[in-house]
Amino acid sequence: MSKRDYYEVLGVGRDASEREIKKAYKRLAMKFHPDRNPGDKAAEASFKEVKEAYEILTDANKKAAYDQFGHAGVDPNRGGGGGYGGAGDFGDIFGDVFGDIFGGGRRGGQRQAARGSDLRYNLELSLEEAVKGLTKELRIPTLASCDVCDGSGAKKGSSATTCGTCHGQGQVQMRQGFFTVQQPCPTCHGRGKIIKDPCSKCHGDGRVEKTKTLSVKIPAGVDTGDRIRLAGEGEAGEFGAPPGDLYVQVTVREHAIFVRDGNNLYCEVPISFSKAALGGEIEVPTLDGKVSLKIPAETQTGRMFRLRGKGVKSVRSHAVGDLLCKVVMETPVNLNERQKELLREFEATLTGESKKHSPKAEGFFDGVKKFFQDLNS
């Protein structure tokens, strides 16, 4: 079956602790265990999937490789001629979680060739790239169908035969004390088939390691957390089974000027004391260049101005966000004597008129005065 994202399988976030991962694993393994769901193939498949996700995410090295490269980073078949492994083995679940609560049971039916694993590629973009869209060339390490044997794993003119040990199931029963568990077949290594004359290139695996280059169109407006699915661009399936998909996971880097919130952009623009008091026009940066913004007289620091349509075009609709500019008044520095003198003269003109010129300051000091009066009464 298709390999889903391991974090999604366990229902945990990417920042989940090992304890949270183990807790989720126990709950799901108990829910899907084959002995609780006899004859339920879907539950058995889910059980195997949960176990595989747990094994990867609780191994520090495997988890790091998976976080970077997705399933390609932890595929046990990447060594060349290796056998089937991973999710198909659930015999050792007893020691991990349930002790000797459950017993095993033989499941009928021949093992089907597995669909190729899905791959994930972590793509980091600048804000400009994410907003405008672009085409990216991606180099993807993957498993491709062997071009010598056409994915069969067998030498030209020969073919695979059903394993006589497991009769095509890929697993055998093992008696351990009072319990019976299943393990990968030691003869066919869990494949269910025997290749007597393996292909010289893929050594019987049917797939070979390959790094392919894809040209991927990134739509305008993508944001961190968005995922682009490329159907059929994952790993090749086993022995001619369908390939998996490739998921491009988008992360947008922080910007030096703008902060993005959905389709809106935010920025802070410094203005001088005189410009805030007297009003005028200032230049404001946008992703398309500078625009002029009219500042009314007596503008207070922290006031927000909205420039409609200067934000981000939605990737899912025709809506366009806004640019919100917060003006921040700068206190002048490195003043010469003449400038200081002018400010002193200006300050002197405000004496006795604070309510008129600084209503917020006057209200604040009135509040402080009342606070201490109440405190001492």
Swiss-Prot record:
> SMART domains in the record, alphabetically?
DnaJ
Q: How is the cofactor bound?
A: Binds 2 Zn(2+) ions per monomer.
Q: Which NCBIfam families match?
A: DnaJ_bact, PRK10767.1
Task: Say yes or no: keyword Repeat present.
Answer: yes
Instruction: Name its species.
Output: Shewanella sp. (strain ANA-3)
Mention one GO molecular function. Answer: zinc ion binding
This protein is called what? Answer: Chaperone protein DnaJ
Where do the ZnF regions (CR-type) fall? 133-211
